[in-house]
Each structure stands twice: as C-alpha cells, then as structure tokens.
Curated annotation (Swiss-Prot):
UniProt cross-references to Gene3D superfamilies, sorted A to Z: Cell division topological specificity factor MinE
Family the UniProt entry places it in: Belongs to the MinE family.
Protein name: Cell division topological specificity factor
InterPro entries the UniProt entry points to: MinE, MinE_sf
Alphabetically ordered keywords of this record: Cell cycle, Cell division
Function: Prevents the cell division inhibition by proteins MinC and MinD at internal division sites while permitting inhibition at polar sites. This ensures cell division at the proper site by restricting the formation of a division septum at the midpoint of the long axis of the cell.
Gene Ontology process terms (BP): cell division; regulation of division septum assembly
One matching Pfam family: MinE
Organism of origin: Methylorubrum extorquens (strain PA1) (Methylobacterium extorquens)
C-alpha cells in the first residue's frame, strides 16, 4: 500500500462491507446462531430487490444486544435516481 492510497478517502461501500464483516465475526463468537445476521441480511436484500434496485454493498445491518432486548439496525443507501420496480400483477383464482 502506498502513501497515496493510504491518504485517499475510502468509499462508503467498502466501509460498510468492513463493518458488516466485523459484525459477522462478532456474532460468530458471541452467538450460538452464527448465521443469524447473514440470514437476515439476505432476506432483507431479497425483499428490497423486489421493489427497488439497490447495490448489495450499500446495505448495512447492525445487531445490538442489550439487557433483555436486541436491536436490529438497517441502513440502506439509495441512489437519488433509484429505479422503483413496478408491482407484478398476480392472478386471482375465481371462486
């Protein structure tokens, strides 16, 4: 790594990815269900992808544990010109 790349500001995507990796590592050590954050992240991304086009590395999920309660925080960076997907038409059964 050169001095120039060290001084260059990092993008939010790489910072978010690094934070998520730290959270995942922490969860694996602390929790009996190491896949909880991974599962939640994938399910949340799949639901969001049905409605809006968003880059996967722009989603940050944080799980904080307190006394008797856990808090799940989700930060999603939407571009200004986000593409909203139209709702799919569903066929209803005629009764």
């Amino acid at each position: 790594m050169s001095v120039l790349t060290f001084l260059k500001p990092r993008g939010s995507g790489s910072v978010a990815r690094e934070r998520l990796q730290l959270i995942l590592a922490h969860e694996r050590v602390e929790n009996g269900r190491p896949d909880l954050i991974i599962t939640l992240r994938e399910e949340i991304l799949n639901v969001i992808a049905k409605h809006v086009t968003v880059e996967r590395d722009k989603v940050q999920i944080k799980l904080e544990r307190g006394e008797g309660v856990s808090t799940l925080g989700v930060d999603i960076e939407f571009p200004v010109d986000a593409v909203i997907k139209p709702k799919a038409k569903t066929k209803r059964a005629i009764a």
